[in-house]
């Protein structure tokens, strides 16, 4: 979740994002970066720079390498550079420069993927990175891109050349034609892969529908309705076995859907009437909760099977528990920016 150009909360938070398995989340700050354990919440790393903001932080599971991009009022690094930080040495060990601003970075153990506003470049994850591939995208100011972290699956997904399309390439065999999915009519706002790389979830800027596709065939598996009013989708994430997804939006809500068993999702009692519009047959979330502050947030499933974590732009952390009926209760609340590593 990129909070540039301005975070209204004035807490210095520029960016927050989960690592590949959601076990940690990282924050880019006006004066450095921080890393937290997601559940239970615990500050793991706090790197402060005397002068310099970090607008993007990408972790590689829990290893010592992080990708940093400078940003904020006084960027620590030029915004057109990717810096690979070694947290054991407490310094940058790799630097890659581009002619335009870096929008996002994705890592896997063997690759560095850099997202620019209309192309994606793939490099070897070596001391002297070697460029392997370049993929053109439509205009992509949000830096949308997902990289499967699974060692047996090298899928990379990103907005295609056509509006609303998702393109999926296999980095292990790029000679294979990419899978092109016409996911939405409008501009994409969010994409997410499950951990195994077998499913991709998508949302458009309209934000009313979430669609789930099979990554190998491109076939639509499920269409889920977040709501009837347009919304800005901040985050979509699958749980570990891809049976559930959680979705956060600017309506201050986090919705939970069944991704594999559609019978769990709510449906209108009028759904069986064939003459009614498609809206009434929609699959709605079986559970949802309101983030009390209404602040922009990212969400992911916790370590317990029926728990969801929300990380908010105002520095608040929420853990909610839900039951099979969809009833939701708040379990934990904390201010993660104010804690120190010995508090929890």
Curated annotation (Swiss-Prot):
WD repeat boundaries on the chain: 183-223, 228-267
GO molecular function annotations of the record: phosphatidylinositol-3,5-bisphosphate binding; phosphatidylinositol-3-phosphate binding; protein-macromolecule adaptor activity
Gene3D superfamilies hit by this protein: YVTN repeat-like/Quinoprotein amine dehydrogenase
InterPro entries listed in its UniProt record: PROPPIN, WD40/YVTN_repeat-like_dom_sf, WD40_repeat_dom_sf, WD40_rpt
SMART domains assigned: WD40 (SM00320)
GO CC annotation terms, alphabetical: cytosol; lysosome; phagophore assembly site; phagophore assembly site membrane
A GO BP entry: cellular response to starvation
Domain of life of the organism encoding this protein: Eukaryota
UniProt keyword terms in alphabetical order: Autophagy, Lipid-binding, Lysosome, Repeat, WD repeat
Subcellular location: Preautophagosomal structure; Lysosome
Main location as per UniProt: other
Pfam hit, one: PROPPIN
Recorded family membership: Belongs to the WD repeat PROPPIN family.
Function: Component of the autophagy machinery that controls the major intracellular degradation process by which cytoplasmic materials are packaged into autophagosomes and delivered to lysosomes for degradation. Binds phosphatidylinositol 3-phosphate (PtdIns3P), and other phosphoinositides including PtdIns(3,5)P2, forming on membranes of the endoplasmic reticulum upon activation of the upstream ULK1 and PI3 kinases and is recruited at phagophore assembly sites where it regulates the elongation of nascent phagophores downstream of WIPI2.
Protein known as: WD repeat domain phosphoinositide-interacting protein 3
UniProt organism field: Xenopus laevis
